[in-house]
Amino acid sequence: MATYEGKVFTEEQEALVVKSWTVMKKKTAELGLKFFLKIFEIAPSAKKLFSFLRDSNVPLEQNTKLKPHAMSVFVMTCESAVQLRKAGKVTVRESNLKKLGATHFKYGVVDEHFEVTKFALLETIKEAVPDMWSDEMKNAWGEAYDRLVAAIKIEMKACSQAA
C-alpha cells in the first residue's frame, strides 16, 4: 500500500479514482480546458504564470496553446492518481517530476496556487462524474493530488537550494 505522512492510499480509494478516470478519459481535452478555466475564474492573476497567456487578447477558450497544455496537465494529474497505489509513490516520470519542480519554482508557484488548483480539479471531476461523486471519491482524489503536489514541492525545494 502507498503510504504518505502516515496515511495509506487504500484499495477503495484507488478503485474510486480508477472508476472515475475511466469515464473522464474519453473527454480529456474538454475536461482539461474546464479545469484551467476554473483555475482562472477563481484566481485570474494565475494567468500571469503562463507566458502564452500574459500578452494574449484571445479569449481563454480559444487560446490554441492553453488547450493542449490544459489537457496535458489534466491527464498527467489523473494518471498519477491512478498509478499511486500500484506504484506506492507518485509515478510521474522522474525527469518530468524534476522538470515540474523546476518550472513551478521558476514561475513562482506558491501554496495558494496549489490549493486553487486542487479545488478546481475536484470541481471538474465532480461535474464530470456527478452520478459517481461522493465524499469518499472527493477524499481519494484529494489525497492523490496532495501526494503529487508534495512530490513537486520536493523538487521545487531542490531548485531553491541549488539557486
From Swiss-Prot:
Q: Which GO terms describe its molecular function?
A: heme binding; metal ion binding; oxidoreductase activity; oxygen binding
The record's function comment reads: Phytoglobin that reduces nitrite to nitric oxide (NO) under anoxic conditions (e.g. during flooding or in waterlogged soil). May not function as an oxygen storage or transport protein. Has an unusually high affinity for O(2) through an hexacoordinate heme iron because of a very low dissociation constant.
Positions of the Globin domain: 8-157
> Which Pfam families does this entry report, sorted A to Z?
Globin
The note on the cofactor says:
Binds 1 heme group per subunit.
Instruction: Locate the site labelled Homodimerization.
Output: K138
Lineage of source species: Eukaryota, Viridiplantae, Streptophyta, Embryophyta, Tracheophyta
Q: Which reaction does it catalyse?
A: Fe(III)-heme b-[protein] + nitric oxide + H2O = Fe(II)-heme b-[protein] + nitrite + 2 H(+)
Q: Which InterPro entries match?
A: Globin, Globin-like_sf, Globin/Proto, Leghaemoglobin-like
Q: Which family does it belong to?
A: Belongs to the plant globin family.
Instruction: State whether it acts alone or in a complex, and with which partners, per the record.
Output: Homodimer.
Residues engaged in binding heme b: S51, K65, H69, K99, T103, H104
Q: Which organism is it from?
A: Gossypium hirsutum (Upland cotton)
GO CC annotation terms, alphabetical? cytoplasm; nucleus
Q: Motif Homodimerization at which residues?
A: 41-45, 111-123
Name of the protein in question: Anaerobic nitrite reductase HB1
Q: State the top-level EC class.
A: oxidoreductase
Give cofactor(s), names only.
Answer: heme b
Question: Localized where?
Answer: Cytoplasm; Nucleus
Q: Which UniProt keywords apply?
A: Cytoplasm, Heme, Iron, Metal-binding, Nucleus, Oxidoreductase
What's the EC number here?
A: 1.7.2.-
